[in-house]
Amino acid sequence: MATIKEIKEFLVTVKELESPIFLELEKDNRSGVQKEISKRKRAIQAELDENLRLESMLSYEKELYKQGLTLIAGIDEVGRGPLAGPVVAAAVILSKNCKIKGLNDSKKIPKKKHLEIFQAVQDQALSIGIGIIDNQVIDQVNIYEATKLAMQEAISQLSPQPEHLLIDAMKLDLPISQTSIIKGDANSLSIAAASIVAKVTRDELLKEYDQQFPGYDFATNAGYGTAKHLEGLTKLGVTPIHRTSFEPVKSLVLGKKES
């Protein structure tokens, strides 16, 4: 009779819930065996559910595949709302029908999984472009225009160039056909891939800024206006990476000039 450990190792090879192997093993009345059967069935169901989720997030891409298009770039940005740091956009072309387990809107991915999924996108993407527009340009042209500049920069880095763009809630003045999708990072795998690339890239930049400008908690808050960040602004003042067109930074700068 096989040991429970041997059965556990064997069950990993079973891929279907209807497999006759389960029926056979269910005759074994050892509680440990029954526990391993239940565990493996849950794992198979989770894999099926994940595959269905990923399939549903390929609906926009599949419509474009039907039109004979394969070089489809997902575009997304991170960093519109922070008081400090750049806005970062990413453009990602995935291979046809590419499914990356766990890939989702970056806001829905557990932080501990960010780097793992970022690496999976890096490994499986046909091409990746990243656009970074700093706080000075944001202050000059406004955050909406800066976001478009970041996206255009990211797209310009792609090789090969895309045949179609899937963009998260934005239209770009480019001679490439495009689809603007509301909540695109939750509805398109290509945009979700761009979302995690932009997120990890920006988070890593803010960790570097945290070393340069301690006291604002940039490594944790990514430049957003948390209590620790606002406390740092009050105690230490404005840094070269702060957006002086954003409140309360703007008022602090004006107050300093007036005094």
UniProtKB/Swiss-Prot annotation:
Its cofactor is Mn(2+); Mg(2+). Residues 70-258 form the RNase H type-2 domain. One of its GO terms (biological process) is DNA replication, removal of RNA primer. Its EC number is 3.1.26.4. Manganese or magnesium. Binds 1 divalent metal ion per monomer in the absence of substrate. May bind a second metal ion after substrate binding. It is found in: Cytoplasm. A divalent metal cation binds at D76, E77, D168. Pfam families: RNase_HII (PF01351). It comes from the Bacteria. Belongs to the RNase HII family. This is Ribonuclease HII. It comes from Streptococcus pneumoniae serotype 4 (strain ATCC BAA-334 / TIGR4).
